Structure formats: structure tokens, C-alpha cells
Amino acid sequence: MTASHHPGNHEQISRREAMRRGVCGAAGMIAAGSVASRVLAAPAEKTPEQVAAELKKTRDEAAKAKAKAKKVQTKSVIQVFLWGGMSHNDTWDPKPGTGYDYLGEFDKFIPTNVNGIQLGALLPNLAKQADKYSLIRSMTHGNNGHETAAYLMQTGHLPGGRLAYPAVGAIFTFFKKDQYKGLLPPYVVMLEAAGRFSEEGFLGPAYKPFATGGDPNAPRFEVQGIVNRGIDDGRQKARRELVDKVNLFGYGLADVPEMAAAETARQNAYGLILGKGREVFNLESEPTELRDRYGRNTFGQECLAARRMVEAGVPYITISFPGGWDTHSNHFATMRNQCASLDQGLATLLGDLKDRGLLESTLVWCTGEFGRTPKVSWEPPWNGGRHHHGDVFTVLVAGGGFVGGRVVGSSDEKGEKVKERPVYPADLLGSMYLLAGIDASAKLPHPWGLDAYVLDTENEGMKAAGLLEELM
């Protein structure tokens, strides 16, 4: 299931053989110049860089052929963002036998419903759904800073310069804007944007995600800054009518892009509260048993709300996991608490999407900006913590054209470095764009008229090892 390549496996030439060939070559020049020319012009052994480039090209071509053959494209994306960086060794990429300094308290591992795939014991529900998702165990970018790593994972571009590139959600919104005619905003974040993972970048405010605020686990979904606690619908409608009457200044500047974007945002907000779009967030209409299965907590109900948004056709939904994963200290207690709701909510979401026939056209991906150090820091002030680790970590992908039940790549015996088949941000995002019918080489409108593309690894010096043809 893993793709491996060993650039050192070329024909080995001994010193004696090299000397023999040199003598024969010299004799050939005397005897027949044309033959000597052909010998001297023979291609040299390929460098590791050349081998890697050829392998990338092969993967890219295979992925494009497989994506073209698929009957269904990605229509919606649900991104579960684990801000802070979740430990890969304790969850998706367990390392039995590495000892207490690496395992700590989490020395139990469980099989999944797919032969050969094992998870940490913190994820029992997701272990039963492994046939629905695949794991990329060789994700890497090598950066250990929160903001920079999040930017890499969300844009596929190197940070730097005066303008930020748009995140993947903004890219989806830009390319799907003519196809989506729903009442809800096309790019929704629950509950708040965290860090640089949902930027509109230089595309402008029209592609900024709508952050819902509030709490879908509460009896009434409240949009921060628009609906205040205790204000009923009648009063809210009266407020809107009053604003419309006195907004003469705004109407006079309707052609100004910034004012038009602000008005669009305001109308979107009212659509959530007073229009049919509000019903999407009325989770009380769901069966009690199903709500319980998702988990009666914020993350579980976010997952349920995300499924309802998919049914409404929203192109891109981000769930920013409530509470962080930045476990420099108190790691083991935090992981137990966080993984309980992650395991329940995400497993139920995948099963629910599958049962409703939505998983094939809905791409789900779950990751933080990086993983965490495999070796535990027991000394003060950490007292059992794991730190930032961008050298290798794991990403879960499901649906939207990705097949389930597979593992791509591997980390080394302790989960510290990539062992086989590195996957870089551009490889992951490029694969997602491909499955959604988005041309990753397409040019984007830049406010300064500069050349800017969805992805541009060669000109930026970004690493790439090839699209994820193994999962298509």
C-alpha cells in the first residue's frame, strides 16, 4: 500500500569493470571513431534528483488519468483543522516497542477494520471506519512554527512577501462561485478562524470565510455580532429594515468593491439568521439518537452541522477543533480529553456521509499544521510533553474521489523522519484540486498584476514528490 523508491538501486560498476571499459573505449577510438563517439555520448547514470523528478512526473500523470476516469468530482470539502498540531504517534501512526520515553502512557494499540492498519487506542470508533478513509503517514514540510506551518498546509506556498496567498477554501470558493447558488456563504468556518489557515489572501474580502461564532451545541445557533442573546426574530427583522432605510451612503457606493463585499457579508449573515439558510443550523430537527451519536459537545455538533451544510451544497466548510492540540505540557491528559470527542464526532460524520450517499462527492481531510515530537519531554517545565514536529506527521483523507482503507508512505521506526514516499503540501493540495476539477496551474488575479498561480512549486522552490495517485 505504500509507494517506495530507492534511488540508490542502480547498476553498480566495479573499479575493475570501469578500467576495462575505459581501455576498451580508448581502443575503440583508434579503431573506429564513430563507435567511440557513441560510447562517449552514452547517457550517464541518473542523479537522485533526476530519478525523483521522473517519479513525480509518473505519479502526476497517473493521478490525472485516474481522476479523469472518475464519474463524480468533489462537490464539497469538510476540513477538520487540529490547530496546534496533534501527535501522530499517539493516534494515526503508532510505534509499538519504542519504549516509555516515546510511548509514555499510551502503550496500547488497536486493529482497524482494514487488515494491516493499526491505530492508537485513543481512536476506537475511527478504527471501525478505516475502510472509509486513508492515511498519509509521510506528510512533511519541515517547519516547526505554528503560523508558517499552517500557511504552508493551507496554501501550498512559501510564506514571504507583502501579500498572502489565498487558502485552499478561498481557492475552492473562487473556482466554484459560478456553480454554487445556495443561500449560505460558500466558505464557512465553525466557529472561528484560528491562525493563518482560512485566509482569503490577495483574492480579497469576497472570498473571506464566514465565521459563524456561537455554538451549534446550544439550543439556538447565534451568529456573533449579528444576533444577540435575547433578541427575537421580529426585533431582528425590524432592525434590518431600519438599516436598509438609512443605508443611503452604502447604496451610493455600491460599485466600490469594498462596500459591495461588506454588503454581501451583511446579507449572508441575515440569510443565516432570518432566511432558509438558518434551517441548516437548526440541529433540533435531527433525531435525538443521531445527535447523541455525534456527541453532545461542540465538536460533535459542528460535525453534524457540517453534514447539513454539505446537503445544502456549501462548497467548503472548515471545522476548527475547539481547544488546542499544542501539548508542550499536560500532553497525556489533554490527548485523552480531545481524542474522545474527535474520535466520536469524526467517525460518526464519515459513517453518516457514507450512509446518505454523500461521501463519494464530499472530501474530508483532517490534520493540524504539523505533528508532535515522538520523544516525550519528561523534564520540568514540560513534565510529559510533546513539541512541534514538521519533519513527518499524518493526514487523514476520505471521500471526494479518494479511496479508503489505504496508507501512503511511512515514517521511520520512531516516527521522527519520513522513511518512504514523502508527501509535501503541494502534493496534497494539488491532489484535492485535481479531484475537484480545479487546474492547479491556473493563474489567479493578482492586485498588482503579478503572475500568481494556484500552485507554483517550480518557480517558488517548493518541494513536491507527486500527486496522490495511490489514493485515486
Model-derived features: where do they sit?
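Ligand-binding pockets and gating/stacking loops
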Residues: 1-472
